[in-house]
């Protein structure tokens, strides 16, 4: 996951936002950390912990943005698999057999096993860790939207502080207009 990120999007097609919304409703409310870093700039956003904080549409957009931005390579995957093989807790025969299956599948994304699903009941989405710092703001906006409130937002900050990056993300998530004050020569 740390190498390929949400790679299964390319093979399965993009799930609609309703898919995440329904999964959020089904996910048990557990005391899990909101996010868990998995390396390479990615984290798992636990849907179990996000109830009533972010809208499914917001999570969906963060997930899609991550899938577009994070393009791991086969060489990176092979490098990580070599590290895993050299440090595996499994026997050399088991490790070699699993790696051979993966190679024969042309390195298709791997799903969680049934025993894993039964033991952990995972409900998460992979997102870029760079989005985490925006969660307090996204939560406030989503809360207003969930209550039917219109929202107008002004972003102020120093030069190169990330205002344009944040505005672009907000525009993507909420399909809103962005007006850059720099364009008005005040």
Where in the sequence are the language-model features?
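Long, basic/Gly/Ser/Thr-rich N-terminal segments
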Residues: 1-113
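N-terminal pre-Walker A segment at the start of P-loop NTPase domains
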Residues: 119-146
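P-loop (Walker A) phosphate-binding loop of NTP-binding proteins
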Residues: 158
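Conserved lysine of the Walker
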Residues: 163
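Active-site signature of alpha/beta-hydrolase-fold catalytic machinery across serine-
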Residues: 169
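Short beta-strand-centered segment that lines the nucleotide-binding/catalytic pocket of NTP-utilizing
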Residues: 174-186
